Amino acid sequence: MHPFTGLATREDGAIKVCCRSLPIGNIKDMSLEEAWNSDAMKEVRRQVLNGERPAVCQPCFDLEDQGVQSLRQRHITDSSPESRINLYPNALDSLSADYSMPFELPTMEIKINNLCNLKCRMCNPLDSTQWKDWSSIVSHYEKEGNYLVDAVKSLGLEKAPYVGLFEDKLHFWENLEKLLPYFKRVEFAGGEPLMDPSHYKILDLLSKN
């Protein structure tokens, strides 16, 4: 249901189908509105409706192949009132023949930056500014080919721990304002959102709608 109901962002600028998926674009190169009906997103929708496995959804399929319930499965079951299939039962009504959809997302999962006051053991520099000893664990991520290795290196997070690529992107804020009348649910993660001034800016926008 995720490709038909919302988008997710990651601190490095990634725009994703959901918080678990691989990126379909980046805020540096495209807006949320462009990503919503990009060729990549429309192809994901086509594959989902044809029972195929989109490459960007591989993290969920990897879990399912091991017998573990994935985020994808949790949101397509009607046994949970919180599943997207129950929250947005009419999501596919506005789907066009070319797999495009109106830019009227009912939900978003937002990560704007990695500002945080904690260094949880399961975390990493992309999600917390407190992670300053990445070199001590990076080898474990390298062995599994984790995207974090390249992300941390390309953003220079080994030396300067803060990353926030959304704050100065005018089109991001313009797109958020466009979506305000349609939002039914917005989920925040980080970093620690309550430390982030941008989080309060979004809350102010939401409170006006």
Tell where the protein language model's regions lie, with residue ranges.
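Accessory C-terminal segments flanking Radical SAM cores
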Residues: 1-82
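Conserved alpha-helical substructure of the radical SAM core
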Residues: 67-209
